[in-house]
């Protein structure tokens, strides 16, 4: 565990001139680099939101121990295989997405003797990450109040579906339905659509990362632990951003519009090129639109000269643009648009997008490839161990406690 008393840093400048036991700072032409080499984390979380936070800290150099129940076969996503997937022991493709760099401890928390192992770990831990619904952590004896008694400096971060006072089970798809996201996703007049990734889980994970980092900074200042909690429903509502503001400020209720944007045009529209590719435009200002018209040789733009006019006359504008864009080959047009700083891109498959990424954005080991959780530049990119088999590190972890 880290000793906050060694921390002597001016938090307002955060220039990295002081050596802090729980952070190592050093100067660089890029922003100050931070390694959390001595942070110890106990992960009592499963599925995606909580484990994504654990992997984030592992990528920063923290030691992350993932506690899993042998009764359930560990994290449920170990069994979430796509059709035709054979899996690798107790590791599925889904499980690998957020579990790199962790050690797996398979114990039954309902068993007093086995739960005592977690209590020993907590005494020297900095952070606990949990994803229990309301009341479950207390039943298992791993709630914040219980663990704080063992370690007053402990920071406890919990993901819930609906908050601490609502025992309803929260899954990403349900939250998408209840938060308004599905109502504005999909084509106009069609059935609501769920997003094809668990975006609410991802957003909640980011919210918890931020909360835990703030709690760590506070602890450097006052030496106190802290309980922080993020509900999936809250993370979803906060992510409505401009769509939420359209209602709160303008009383304009958001509705599904397909790819279209309620406030900007042409923004999100797809157009077919001469070679059959789909090109998306995301024009954000009048200068970009004028550049687009010059490239496409559109001279009569009187009814489209401002963004508000383009939003009002969207259908007429799209007809004009479609007739021009279909005359161009996709790569030639895209290159021209990029050169003239007109935001545009070709629709790309997931496979194509991943194949185009540079290798340093990936985690690789033993023939396995994964996506990094932390992608900001200016920091060391650490190599991580592959996602663990269930209970792979039991003996190592228990031996270290003796």
Language-model-detected regions and their locations in the chain:
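Short hydrophobic targeting helices and cationic amphipathic motifs
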Residues: 4, 15, 19-27
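N-terminal helix-loop segment corresponding to the beta1-alpha1 unit
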Residues: 13, 32-221, 389, 393-402
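Acyl-CoA thioester-binding alpha/beta core of soluble enzymes
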Residues: 32-73, 124, 131, 150, ...
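Residue-level detector of beta-strand structural context in well-folded domains
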Residues: 94-96, 228, 269
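Substrate-binding/catalytic subdomain of NAD(P)-dependent oxidoreductase enzymes
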Residues: 216-255
């Amino acid at each position: 565990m880290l000793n906050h008393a060694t921390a002597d840093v001016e938090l307002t400048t955060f220039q990295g001139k002081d050596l802090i036991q729980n952070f190592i700072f050093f100067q660089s032409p890029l922003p100050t680099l931070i390694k959390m080499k001595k942070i110890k984390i106990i992960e009592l979380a499963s599925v995606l939101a909580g484990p994504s936070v654990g992997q984030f800290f592992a990528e920063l150099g923290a030691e992350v121990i993932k506690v899993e129940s042998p009764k359930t076969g560990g994290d449920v996503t170990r069994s979430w295989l796509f059709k035709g997937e054979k899996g690798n022991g107790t590791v599925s493709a889904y499980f690998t997405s957020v579990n790199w760099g962790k050690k797996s401890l398979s114990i039954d928390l309902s068993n007093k003797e086995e739960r005592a192992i977690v209590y020993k770990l907590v005494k020297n831990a900095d952070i606990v990450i949990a994803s229990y619904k309301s009341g479950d952590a207390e039943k298992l004896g791993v709630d914040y109040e219980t663990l704080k008694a063992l370690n007053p400096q402990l920071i406890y971060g919990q993901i819930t579906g609906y908050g601490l006072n609502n025992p309803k089970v929260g899954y990403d798809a349900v939250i998408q339905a209840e938060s308004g996201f599905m109502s504005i996703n999909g084509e106009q007049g069609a059935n609501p659509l769920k997003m094809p990734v668990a975006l609410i889980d991802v957003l909640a994970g980011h919210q918890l990362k931020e909360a835990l980092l703030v709690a760590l900074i506070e602890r450097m200042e006052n030496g106190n632990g802290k309980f922080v909690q993020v509900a999936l429903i809250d993370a979803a509502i906060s992510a409505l951003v401009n769509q939420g503001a359209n209602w709160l400020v303008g009383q304009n209720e958001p509705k599904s519009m397909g790819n279209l944007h309620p406030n900007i045009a042409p923004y999100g529209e797809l157009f077919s090129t001469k070679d059959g590719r789909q090109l998306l435009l995301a024009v954000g200002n009048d200068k970009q639109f004028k550049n687009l018209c010059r490239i496409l040789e559109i001279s009569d733009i009187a009814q489209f000269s401002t963004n508000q006019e383009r939003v009002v006359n969207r259908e007429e504008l799209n007809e004009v643009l479609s007739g021009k864009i279909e005359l161009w080959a996709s790569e030639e047009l895209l290159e021209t648009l990029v050169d003239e700083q007109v935001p545009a891109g070709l629709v790309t498959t997931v496979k194509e997008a991943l194949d185009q990424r540079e290798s340093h954005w990936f985690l690789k080991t033993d023939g396995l490839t994964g996506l990094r959780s932390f992608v900001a530049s200016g920091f060391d990119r650490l190599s991580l161990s592959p996602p663990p088999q269930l209970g792979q590190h039991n003996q190592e972890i228990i031996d270290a406690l003796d």
